[in-house]
């Protein structure tokens, strides 16, 4: 019995180490207020509008780039070459931004933050 205890503890330790290394890459969901705060305090981020081009043209958050959700995964995203860059993702209501964030993570992007839809945006809109 005494010989089994060290063996059991070793197995438990290795299992714990393996589990911590297998952490899945995921995106973060934040509120609109947190997104505004992040835009004010961070630098080097990209604001990604994943609505259709016609929706983007009708009005978008200043400085946002447009890559329609439907096109994510179809080809390399030339507008987003740095997969470690902070990317703030939004759409109209939050459904497409969630889908886009999930796709971006699967494509290897590591710093994705999804903050819902422009319907909740209280700041300036650029057309």
Indicate where each model-derived feature is located.
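Hydrophobic beta-strand scaffold positions of dinucleotide-using enzymes
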Residues: 47-49
């Amino acid at each position: 019995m005494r010989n089994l205890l060290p063996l059991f503890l070793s197995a438990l330790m290795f299992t714990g180490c393996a589990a911590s290394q297998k952490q899945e890459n995921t995106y973060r969901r934040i509120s609109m207020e947190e997104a505004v705060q992040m835009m004010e305090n961070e630098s080097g981020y990209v604001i990604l509008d994943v609505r259709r081009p016609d929706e983007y043209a009708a009005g978008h958050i200043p400085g946002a780039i447009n890559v329609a959700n439907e096109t994510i995964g179809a080809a390399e995203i030339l507008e987003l070459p740095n997969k470690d860059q902070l990317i703030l993702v939004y759409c109209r209501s939050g459904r497409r931004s969630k889908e886009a964030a999930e796709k971006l993570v699967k494509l290897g992007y590591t710093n994705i933050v999804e903050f819902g839809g422009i319907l909740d945006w209280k700041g300036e809109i650029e057309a």
